[in-house]
Structure formats: C-alpha cells, structure tokens
Curated annotation (Swiss-Prot):
UniProt name for this protein: ATP-dependent Clp protease proteolytic subunit
Native species: Methylobacillus flagellatus (strain ATCC 51484 / DSM 6875 / VKM B-1610 / KT)
GO molecular function, one term: ATPase binding
Subunit structure: Fourteen ClpP subunits assemble into 2 heptameric rings which stack back to back to give a disk-like structure with a central cavity, resembling the structure of eukaryotic proteasomes.
Compartments, as annotated in UniProt: Cytoplasm
Length: 213
C-alpha cells in the first residue's frame, strides 16, 4: 500500500476513542441518546480524528454523501485532527469533497499532517480555517515494497505518479507553483497556523466562532 507517511503519533490509534461519550436529548417525544459524533453530524459537523485509512475514509465519505442528501445547499463543516495516512483512502475523501454540492468548510484542530494537510487545503475557498495552536505538515508520499526487481520498478513508478498528482492538487488549492510544492514537500515541512495561511493551505486563523463569520 502506498501512503503518505504519518507522523510518529500515527503508530498508535487516536487516544480516548475506546469510550465515546453519549448525549441525551429531551424532546416532546421523550429522551433520545446519541453518541457524540452522531450528535455533531446533526449540526453538519464531520470530525476526522486519527490516521486516514480505509475505515475512516469510508465513514467520512458516507457522512459527506448523507449531509448532501439532507440539504444540498447548506455548508458541511469538516474538522480535522489527523497525522495523515493512506493516499488512496485520503483521495477518496478528497474526491467526495469536490463531488458533493455543498461547500465543505475545513478546520484544523490540533494537527493536519500529510494527507490531513491536503484535505485541509481542499476545503471551499474562503472557508478553510486553523485554530491558533494548530500545526500543519506537508511532505511527499512514502511507499515500501519487497519482491522482484520488475515489481519494485512498477511500485516506484506508482509512487512517483502519485507524488506528481498530489503536488498538482496541493498547488491548485494553495496557489503555489508546482515546482515550489515539489521542493517544499521533499522533506517534512512543518508550519504554524499563521504560516499555513501565508502558504495558502488555509484562509484564516480563528480563535472563536465569531472569527469565522
């Protein structure tokens, strides 16, 4: 599998997800309980937390499609706290973000590294945000393969193809030249929230909801 290498934290599953809080809502029909992520979904909020893999990508894609069906004219809010992960899984999320009719507003909460940074940049123009102490990191994809020389060559070509494609995607969303993207992603490139604004990954640093208005 070819993937964007995640940062060191991705060696572990996101902490604290073993227990998911439940929310109780009172209504005229009585009480109803939701897990916290389902309750956020009612507010059109999708939360990507932890590594990007096939399982998390399938959930995010399903939620994007559901929210589009619910109201195709109302924005979707995509919160990201991710060290990155699988390129193919991430591209599934990316393509769906571009496919759905509603604008997808992105917000970095904590970190958006590797594929997480690309998804952050892929939000609707003018609606991409970072919280003040967020960290963003971009770099080139990483792949490893063992086997016959001919198979290794095939996988090496695939990695180079994906690197070129990802560089063009990042360039299209940041406004940076592809050549600069290629240079800046040659090694891990960490940015503060303010630096990610200057680079074009996000549009604004916000400290409160009022700042996003």
């Amino acid at each position: 599998m070819i993937h964007y290498p995640a940062t060191a934290q991705s060696q572990f599953e996101a902490q604290g997800l073993g227990y998911i809080p439940m929310v109780i809502e009172q209504s005229g029909r009585g009480e109803r309980s939701y897990d916290i992520y389902s309750r956020l979904l009612k507010e059109r909020i999708i939360f990507l937390v932890g590594p990007v893999n096939d399982a998390t990508a399938n959930l995010v894609v399903a939620q994007l499609l559901f929210l589009e069906a619910e109201n195709p004219d109302k924005d979707i809010y995509f919160y990201i706290n991710s060290p990155g992960g699988s390129v193919t899984a991430g591209m599934g999320i990316y393509d769906t973000m571009q496919f759905v009719k509603p604008d997808v507003s992105t917000l970095c909460v904590g970190q958006a590294a590797s594929m997480g940074a690309l998804l952050l940049a892929a939000g609707a123009q003018g609606k991409r945000f970072c919280l003040p102490n967020s960290r963003v990191m971009i770099h080139q994809p990483l792949g490893g393969f063992q086997g016959q020389a001919s198979d290794i060559e095939i996988h090496a070509k695939e990695i180079l193809f994906l690197r070129e494609k990802l560089n063009h995607i990042l360039a299209s969303h940041t406004g940076q030249p592809v050549e600069k993207i290629a240079l800046d992603t040659d090694r891990d490139n960490f940015m503060s929230a303010e630096q990610s604004v200057a680079y074009g990954i996000v549009d604004k640093v916000i400290a409160s909801r009022a700042d996003a208005a």
